[in-house]
């Protein structure tokens, strides 16, 4: 199920379509995720909407995500944001896009993040690679938006993924995990 950003986006999207988000069941929400969710799971019937549009104005979308996070705004880009990642998990605003034939997850800043969070996350990814951690390609888009090549897809298949919070049954909204908890997963 979408959480954080994904739930907020889905609820706003449903409202602009004239649907009360509190009146749809969990199964109906899963049908709206359909084949567009993260990882290997797909849900039928599939009522998901996605876009194959390659070129997005990331700066405009970042501004729109700020409005959505801080107000009840449901403006021009809401449908674009929904179609490019409305089913995604996690708390931060993000989009899934195809650029030069590669599928990317590009993250935007959440309200409590430092202004340069994209650059920070990108530098962490470079450090992880220097330490020998095998991870997908990363990139800093337009100098400020962290992107990672989709790790839940290969050319021919989908890859199951699960978050540490999911494995440990931890509430992702409340910082409650430390490195000791993560090491227990190993």
Task: Enumerate the language-model features and the residues they cover.
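Phosphate/dinucleotide-binding and metal-coordinating scaffold of catalytic cores
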Residues: 1-186
């Amino acid at each position: 199920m979408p959480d954080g950003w994904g739930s907020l986006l889905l609820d706003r999207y449903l409202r602009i379509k004239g649907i009360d988000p509190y009146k749809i069941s969990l199964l109906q929400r899963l049908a709206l995720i359909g084949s567009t969710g993260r990882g290997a799971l797909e849900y039928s019937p599939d009522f998901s909407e996605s876009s194959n549009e390659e070129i997005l104005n990331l700066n405009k979308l970042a501004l729109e995500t700020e409005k959505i996070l801080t107000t009840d705004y449901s403006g021009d880009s809401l449908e674009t944001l929904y179609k490019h990642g409305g089913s995604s998990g996690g708390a931060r605003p993000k989009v899934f896009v195809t650029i030069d034939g590669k599928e990317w997850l590009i993250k935007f800043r959440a309200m409590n993040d430092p202004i340069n969070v994209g650059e920070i996350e990108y530098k962490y990814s470079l450090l992880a690679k220097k330490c020998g951690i095998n991870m997908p390609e990363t990139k800093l888009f337009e100098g400020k938006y962290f992107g990672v090549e989709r790790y839940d897809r290969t050319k021919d298949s989908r890859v199951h993924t699960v978050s540490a919070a999911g494995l440990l049954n931890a509430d992702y909204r409340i910082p409650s995990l430390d490195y000791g908890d993560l090491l227990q997963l190993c």
